[in-house]
Amino acid sequence: GTVLYLALEDDYQRLQERMSRMFGVEGTDKLRFAICAKHLGAGLDEQLEKFIREHPDTRLIIIDTLQKIREVSTDAYSYANDYEIVGKMKQFADRNRICLLLVHHTRKQQAGDKFEMISGTTGLLGCADGAFLLQKEKRTDQNATLDIVGRDQPDQRLHLTRNMEKLSWDLDHAETELWKKPPDPFLKK
């Protein structure tokens, strides 16, 4: 299906260079990009609905970053505000039967639970079906861990190595076994 990537902190030249390094000169009409979008509650909802109507085979929308689409507010962000924002995006994804990936930043300070390092309140995670947290020990490291939590899957930690040639992350190993659907007990008999 079609993928929409809202690269709201990039420009088209950077995207073109990145795609060329990742995939060569071959393109696809299934991957769409935008470098600007309206805010949630101020037109983004309509933009995304229009995209889905024009591309009914859409399966994934990536919004990079959440902060760029947040409603403009003079109020400090609260748990309720964060929960409402993610809740609106989740309702949109559920209604359209797509996966929505919201990219967000982490704080610099360490925390007992790595997911507490996500910038903002716990409301961001409270409403989401799952979260990925990519971390490196140092900014210049070529190795990282990807911690995954979700409602419908076991927690996982993946160890990755950066592939600078393809600008991707390669899986080294998983600390926990990747999720497998349990066998149907009725089919075993």
What is each of the regions a protein language model found here?
Residues 1-84, 91, 173, 180-184:
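Conserved inter-motif catalytic segment of the P-loop NTP-binding fold
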Residues 164-189:
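DNA transaction DNA-binding modules
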